[in-house]
């Protein structure tokens, strides 16, 4: 049984301003995939959520390969955004309508992926690779 560890990050210059997302996927401490993408004008929070959604959509696309080739049975997400992690886990109330839409999309993707998924907040220093991809 292998865990897929996914580190995501998002940021904007200006908040709102030009924004980017990034993420890195690891299995057994080996990098298997990474992404970075400009997302136009957005807030930092929007970028954090869009990074997570992008990662979930990529996992959904690669679900068969992850299950068959890599024997992934569990997914762990890591983010330095305390707000994102606690809102996705249901610990913090979501007031913003756009964030509510992101949460619904995340939960829908979780159901489609149909594997155990957990979310963890980490210090910014432990998210350097995803942060680097945001700032390319």
Language model: regions and residue ranges:
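RNase H-like nuclease fold core
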Residues: 1-46, 57-58
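RNase H catalytic domain
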Residues: 11, 15, 53-134
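Short, conserved alpha-helix that lines the donor NDP-sugar binding/gating region
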Residues: 48, 52
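Alpha-helix C-terminal capping segments
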Residues: 1, 133-136
């Amino acid at each position: 049984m292998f865990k897929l560890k996914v580190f995501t990050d998002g940021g904007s210059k200006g908040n709102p301003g030009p924004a980017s997302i990034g993420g890195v996927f690891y299995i057994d401490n080996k990098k298997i995939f990474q992404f970075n993408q400009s997302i136009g004008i957005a807030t930092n929070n929007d970028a954090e959520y869009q990074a997570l959604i992008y990662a979930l959509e990529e996992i959904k696309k690669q679900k068969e390969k992850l299950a068959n080739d890599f024997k992934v049975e569990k997914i762990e997400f890591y983010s330095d955004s305390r707000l994102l992690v606690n809102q996705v886990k249901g610990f913090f109330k979501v007031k913003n309508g756009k964030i509510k839409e992101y949460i619904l999309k995340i939960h829908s993707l979780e159901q489609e992926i149909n594997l155990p998924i957990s979310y963890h907040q980490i210090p910014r220093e432990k998210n350097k690779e995803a942060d680097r991809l945001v700032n390319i």
